[in-house]
Each structure stands twice: as C-alpha cells, then as structure tokens.
Amino acid sequence: MVAQYTVPVGKAANEHETAPRRNYQCREKPLVRPPNTKCSTVYEFVLECFQKNKNSNAMGWRDVKEIHEESKSVMKKVDGKETSVEKKWMYYELSHYHYNSFDQLTDIMHEIGRGLVKIGLKPNDDDKLHLYAATSHKWMKMFLGAQSQGIPVVTAYDTLGEKGLIHSLVQTGSKAIFTDNSLLPSLIKPVQAAQDVKYIIHFDSISSEDRRQSGKIYQSAHDAINRIKEVRPDIKTFSFDDILKLGKESCNEIDVHPPGKDDLCCIMYTSGSTGEPKGVVLKHSNVVAGVGGASLNVLKFVGNTDRVICFLPLAHIFELVFELLSFYWGACIGYATVKTLTSSSVRNCQGDLQEFKPTIMVGVAAVWETVRKGILNQIDNLPFLTKKIFWTAYNTKLNMQRLHIPGGGALGNLVFKKIRTATGGQLRYLLNGGSPISRDAQEFITNLICPMLIGYGLTETCASTTILDPANFELGVAGDLTGCVTVKLVDVEELGYFAKNNQGEVWITGANVTPEYYKNEEETSQALTSDGWFKTGDIGEWEANGHLKIIDRKKNLVKTMNGEYIALEKLESVYRSNEYVANICVYADQSKTKPVGIIVPNHAPLTKLAKKLGIMEQKDSSINIENYLEDAKLIKAVYSDLLKTGKDQGLVGIELLAGIVFFDGEWTPQNGFVTSAQKLKRKDILNAVKDKVDAVYSSS
C-alpha cells in the first residue's frame, strides 16, 4: 500500500471538487501555533523562542568596509560599428560576521519598540511603520521592535519602484519609514505624495567621517536628506542607532504594549508583476499559524546547531516566515546578499557562504539555476580525465539512488568535496520556494551538495501551504501540506482540469489565510469565498501518496491557435535548465500554434559554442559574446539544443519552441524586468524585444 502523507477530512462538497485534505499528523484539526508553544501573537512567539535559547547566537551580519569599483574596456557593436565601451563592476569588501545572542536580541527588540514610541508612533493599528529596505539584521530588528509595541508594519520591496511605493504609503497612511541610506534619494517624490509620513529612520548614521567610496556614500545620503527637508520640512529624520539610544534612555518611561491575536501584524505588498501592488493583511494569528504549520514539516530535522543563511527579500513572506522559523529552531541567522554570496564577487575577504558556513540555505529557482550553471562551468574547465571521473561518479551515484541500491548517497563525496567547500562545506538542506524549479536542477543540486526541499505558499497564506518533509523526499513535487492548512482542488473546466482526475485549482483554508486585501473589497471578494477558502489561481494535482504537485498558474496558461493550452512556467522551468540559458521568458501569441523563447544567455558556455562554430576567435573574452547575439548560426545552434532539452524532459508538440531571440542584458529588479521575488515582468520583457519576436513568428 502507498504511504499517505495527506488524508481526506470529510467528503467532497460536490462532484466539481476533491475531498479536502490535511497533513496526516493534523487529521483531527489544523495547527494554529507552533508545536510546544503557547503563543497567539508574533511578540509572544519570539519571546518564547528567545527565552528558550538565551545565550546562543541569534543572528550575524557583516559591515561594508568599502565598495571597490573596477572598469574594463569591451568591444561592443553600436549602430553596426565595433566600439570600445567601458563597463564598471562593483565589488564589496566586508568585515567578519558580528553576532547578537537571543538575550541581546530581546533587549534590542524592546529598545527599538520604545524608541519608536518615543519619536511619536502610537501603539495601535493606525500608526504604521513602513519597512522599505533590503534584507538585513536591522530590518528584522525594526520589525521585532514594532511587534513589542503593537505597531503594525507595512512591507515594500526595496525595488518596488516609485509608483508602487507611493501607492503603499498613501493607501496605508504610514507614519514612519525605515530605509537604507542608498534608498534615501528615492524618497524625495514619495514623501511629497504621502503626507502622513512624519518620520524617516535610515540604516546608518550619516557622517562626513564615512570615507567609503571616497565619501560618495556619505554625500549621496547627506544630499538626499537635505532635498527631503526642502520638500517636507516637517519630517524628522533619525538613524537606527538614534532609535536604539532613545529606547534605552526611556526604559523606565515607556512600557511594552503587547498586541492581541486579532490585531494587525503587517500589511505585505505584493511585488506587482501585473497591475498595482495589493496589500495583503496579516493578523498576528495568521502569522503565528503560518509559522506553526511550516514548523511541523521539518521539526525533527533542524535545531539549535543549525546556521541559516538569509538573503532573499524580507518583504517577501517566504523569507519572513523562514527567519521566524529559525528563531523557533534556535538556529543562528547569517545575513547575506546575492551580490556577496561567493568569494568571486568580493574583494579582500571571503564570500558570505564561505565566511558563515551555513547548514541551511533558502533560495528561489533563479538562484539555484545560477548555482547549477556555475558548477557546470567549473566542471567544463576541468582536465579531461578529472572531468571523466566526475561524471562517472555522478552518474553512478544517480543510478544507484534511482534503483535504491545502498551506498549511493555516500558515493562521490570525495569527488564533489570541492564543490561543497565553495558553499561553505556544511550545507545539510536547501529549500526552494517562490517559483517552480526543473526536476533536473533539483536532482543535480541534491546529488552534488545536499537535499533540495521544495516549498509552496503565497503571501495570502502566510507562505505556509506545503514543504517537502525530508523523511518523505521526492523529486518534482511541492510536497507535504503544512500543519495549518486544509486544501482541496476545484474544477477549472475551461482549461480541462477536473477534480475527478485529482486536478484543479488549489483552494486553501486555515488560520494562516489572510482575511482581506487592504482597502480592496473587489480583489478580496474575487479571491476569498464567503466561507473562508482562498482561491490561489494555481493548478494542482494530488499524487497517489497525497503529495501536492503544482502544474501551473491559471493566468500563465495560454490558449494557442489550435485551441490547446500551454503552461508558460512549466516550459520555463524546463528550458531554463539548458546550459546556454541564464534566464528565459516564454511568450505565446494566441494567434500562433507554438511559443517563442526570449533568452538571457549564459555567457561562458555560449562563448565556447561560438568559438567551436568559428563565430568568435579563440582569444575573444566571454564579455564580447554580446556582439554575436544576432548571429544566425549561433541562434540556430542554441535553438536546436533547446529543442533537445525540451524533448529529453518530455515536452511535445505545441510545447516545443517555434524559435528564440536573445535578450542583450540581464533581468534584474533594478532595471524592471523581474520583481524582487525574481518573477518575470512578461509585458516589459516582450515590449523590449517585440520586433525580434514578431520576426521569429514571421519566419517560422
């Protein structure tokens, strides 16, 4: 009999739905808080965690000692002529990690909370603190401080953009903003529109003694503050340290003001990949339930000896819940950035991975694909014999594991040691969330580094829907339901998904589910049923063992000319695994039969291919590959390889690309082609290369 990781609870309401299911450990009732806790608010939760782990390290961070700028001249085609263009790269020089214990963090939380009240924020649902900053220890400390005084937090990605930021500030009537010094210039227009803002708290003190980048960092922040005060002379500005100092000085004057379970904890603004960002309302009871549900799936596998590296945006619910989970485990958080993870991207110091030596790491598909391709590039540069030994060991290990032959897990540990050392050498688990990853990428990284678990959730469900339990490890599934949710699948007739086939739109209910979108009745009524089911817009499928598998999103299913649907995210996860692809956006014109791939190329392997085809000279640098992205011979070769990738991974017919176009440049939150959660902004990407896409369709 097949083991069942979820169980039905009651019968299907009608023939158009599956029976609702829960994690088998929560058959009787779903969790509303983490096991072995008594908390009902985020403040009570962290107090329990901090008191239990007192003297252990809670979090670590690195200071930026200097930012080094390096320039290189590269040849680039401009108006058809080869021209020398200067490109600049920024490299960070960082300190070693500094640490706070859980005891110290308790004091800091209360001091920040008192400091916020001292400057003028009132402990209630009306005065809100806007967190508009990159992930850091100070972001989390501001969040915790606000919780200690019952002050709701509003989160906005540091790359949300001016329009989105203004929308979130005005809609919530936020009274204070915490931000990075580098983001101060971007507040000049928003604070003119958002007249409720009275206080700005910036990450670092602004001092002329700061000589980093020859004083540019200081000067930029100093000038921005002056500009802000010109347009809003009533706004008061403070540094993080100012708030901390005010809190220390008022410890006998201001009491803690704990929130209630039904009070507002935070409003999290979605990244707005389409349309205006929506504010997801999360009460304290929602967040506590979300953390509790997720904790059930990995409770036996993590603990207070683990070291968790964190670099995803804290404005993303996935990262926030994961860091709160780390407190529950008693693990130590190490703050990092995508730019400084590896030693190749820093100067005069080690990268974050080698410096911190994490045991657990969370990322999104784009991060893992970059890791995988970086490893493949290293392998490709090995001597022939070493390369052969590597692939022999890898394929033998893979086959032994697939056939369940004992010893497969340990095979190749010596061969793969160098790769593991580059990630700190101590990783035990990786977790992917936020977007689908190809089965091949999951299997590859699992076998070279450590098991990659898959998580699935949404801001509206407080990130908590599924996490693959390490004891039930399986490739290609979203995994076990968390302990707080009840899930059913509902017919999507127009797309051909029916509950009778164990497929349909994923509907979720539980104490973790948002009660509403902030001041948005229309969106709320569309997403939530009157009896509390949240309609995710994702298409799911129940596996025979009760695992949930996510097939795609309703909005990313496109009907082609012949009446059949293709799943864009599914195709992207497959084609993204190709060695020549750094990122891909699949576009399907509804008047055509097949889609087109818009590709950000992976420079190193593409350069090798161009040299092999005689398109580039052997002495040419990979930087120069940008000059050959419209070469017909190169495009044809990559297109052929992509078709092979698709066929090898089971794609057929209309799922195979009609053609490809190369995109000259990266897709980053800064240039507006992806969100901070690395979700594609499809319309913007298409508009940038529309002529090329039209040309592909015309010739196919």
UniProtKB/Swiss-Prot annotation:
SUPFAM superfamilies in the record: Acetyl-CoA synthetase-like (SSF56801)
Gene giving rise to this polypeptide: FAA1
Annotated positions binding ATP: Y269, T270, S271, G272, S273, T274, G275, E276, P277, K278, G279, V280
PROSITE patterns recorded: AMP_BINDING
Entry function: Activates long-chain fatty acids (LCFA) by esterification of the fatty acids into metabolically active CoA-thioesters for subsequent degradation or incorporation into phospholipids. Also facilitates the transport of LCFAs into the cell, either by active transport or by decreasing the intracellular LCFA concentration. It may supplement intracellular myristoyl-CoA pools from exogenous myristate. Preferentially acts on C12:0-C16:0 fatty acids with myristic and pentadecanic acid (C15:0) having the highest activities. Also involved in long-chain base (LCB) uptake of sphingolipids.
Cellular localisation: Lipid droplet; Cell membrane
Enzyme Commission designation: 6.2.1.3
Required cofactor names: Mg(2+)
CDD domains, per the entry: LC_FACS_euk1
Protein family according to the UniProt entry: Belongs to the ATP-dependent AMP-binding enzyme family.
Disulfide bonds: none
Cross-link for Glycyl lysine isopeptide (Lys-Gly) (interchain with G-Cter in ubiquitin), residue positions: K189
Protein name (database record): Long-chain-fatty-acid--CoA ligase 1
Domain note: The FACS motif is required for catalytic activity and substrate specificity.
Pfam families: AMP-binding
Oligomer status and interactors: Interacts with FAT1.
Record key words, sorted: ATP-binding, Cell membrane, Fatty acid metabolism, Isopeptide bond, Ligase, Lipid droplet, Lipid metabolism, Magnesium, Membrane, Nucleotide-binding, Ubl conjugation
Biological-process GO terms, alphabetical: long-chain fatty acid import into cell; long-chain fatty acid metabolic process; long-chain fatty-acyl-CoA metabolic process; sphingoid long-chain base transport
Cellular component terms (Gene Ontology): endoplasmic reticulum; lipid droplet; mitochondrial outer membrane; mitochondrion; plasma membrane
